[in-house]
């Protein structure tokens, strides 16, 4: 369930459409929005002062004419790096060490060797995304011995901490 902060009250919304279920009288009283509101709906809040996005990326809000004048926009950049990158590492290691297959065998009371398992030591790791989450993940795999860490991002031409190389997606 998503919540949008409406002045002194919280109005829960269940639809991913954000503000579509908010009555007009609430829209007129709203000064702060928290969560996801489709950019094209921002103009329906005449007294809006601040939008706090749960997303790190807020590019859709930055297009000309989307954000009403004087409205402050903040994002969740930096909020998810450690937790999400640790989860990514856990999933990578589970797959690399064949933990799902061994779990399935254990449930079936089968104790067969599935062959050697690998290590990140000395390997090259490709990371899709070189933002906050990608940088945290790069540090984690490097700490486990990855020899090289390569990052993909929208555009190349810059260095990013924790990565040996950065390539652009050519969008």
Language-model-detected regions and their locations in the chain:
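Short, well-ordered coil/turn elements that cap or connect secondary structure elements
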Residues: 7, 27, 45-46, 67-68, ...
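Short, small-residue-biased leader/transition segments that mark boundaries at the very start
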Residues: 2-6
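Short acidic low-complexity segments
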Residues: 17-25, 39-43, 158-171
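Mobile, glycine- and charge-enriched loop segments
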Residues: 26-29, 106-125
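A short beta-strand-loop structural module common to alpha/beta enzyme folds
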Residues: 7-20
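Phosphate/diphosphate ligand-binding glycine-rich loop within oxidoreductases
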Residues: 29-103, 114-117
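Rossmann-like dinucleotide/phosphate-binding beta-alpha-beta segment
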Residues: 116-171
């Amino acid at each position: 369930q998503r919540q949008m902060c409406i002045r002194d009250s919280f109005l829960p919304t269940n639809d991913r459409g954000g503000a579509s279920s908010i009555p007009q009288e609430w829209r007129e009283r709203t000064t702060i929005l928290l969560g996801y509101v489709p950019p094209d709906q921002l103009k329906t809040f005449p007294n809006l002062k601040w939008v706090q996005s749960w997303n790190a990326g807020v590019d859709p809000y930055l297009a000309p004419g989307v954000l009403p004048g004087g409205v402050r926009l903040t994002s969740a950049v930096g909020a998810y790096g450690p937790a999400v990158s640790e989860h990514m590492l856990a999933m990578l290691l589970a797959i690399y060490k064949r933990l799902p297959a061994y779990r399935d065998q254990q449930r079936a009371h089968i104790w067969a060797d599935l062959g050697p398992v690998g290590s990140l030591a000395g390997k090259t790791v490709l990371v899709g995304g070189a933002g906050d989450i990608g940088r945290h993940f790069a540090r984690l795999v490097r700490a486990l011995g990855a020899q090289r860490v390569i990052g993909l991002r929208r555009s190349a031409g810059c260095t990013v901490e924790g990565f040996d190389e950065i390539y652009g997606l050519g969008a």
